[in-house]
């Protein structure tokens, strides 16, 4: 489906389109509109939900970042990679792809390490790439890891 909006107070955060001469014809995937003291987000879901897997990683990462805003952790990865966060400061990252993938787990700067629950290995953080924003952005850390096809890793974060 296509979301049509006839207002200038809504902004396309993620859009899809096809290149044209001198520009792009955009179709909103994720819209943001200021509402009261917050923001209202509208995420366009394709008629065939399986098409969500076709979104590029950059679009998925932006959707994940915004939808995880109230959490202290989010995932940057291609499609078919899941992040499962639990209330005891543990998480599982699972790769549902048929090939290996590289992922980044982005956390608040208070998270200083990830401990692999299977083998005890410690992942040290790297400074996350800054997000462009007009508002002050909280400092973030990122943890890079590789996942084999159809595998998962469990971590405790501290």
Please tell me what each predicted stretch does.
Residues 1-158:
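A conserved amphipathic helix/loop scaffold
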């Amino acid at each position: 489906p296509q979301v049509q909006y006839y207002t200038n107070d809504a902004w396309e955060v993620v859009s899809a389109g096809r290149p044209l001469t001198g520009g792009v014809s955009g179709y909103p995937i994720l819209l943001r509109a200021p509402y009261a003291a917050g923001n209202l987000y509208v995420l366009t879901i394709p008629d065939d939900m399986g098409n969500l897997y076709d979104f590029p990683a950059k679009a998925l990462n932006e959707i994940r970042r915004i939808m995880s805003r109230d959490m202290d952790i989010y995932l940057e990865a291609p499609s078919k990679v899941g992040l499962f966060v639990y209330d005891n400061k543990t998480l599982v990252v699972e790769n549902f792809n048929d090939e290996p993938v590289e992922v980044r787990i982005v956390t608040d700067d208070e998270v200083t390490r990830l401990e692999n629950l299977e083998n005890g290995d410690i992942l040290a953080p790297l400074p996350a790439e800054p997000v462009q924003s007009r508002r002050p952005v909280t400092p973030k850390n990122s943890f890079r890891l590789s996942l084999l096809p159809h595998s998962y890793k469990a971590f405790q974060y501290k």
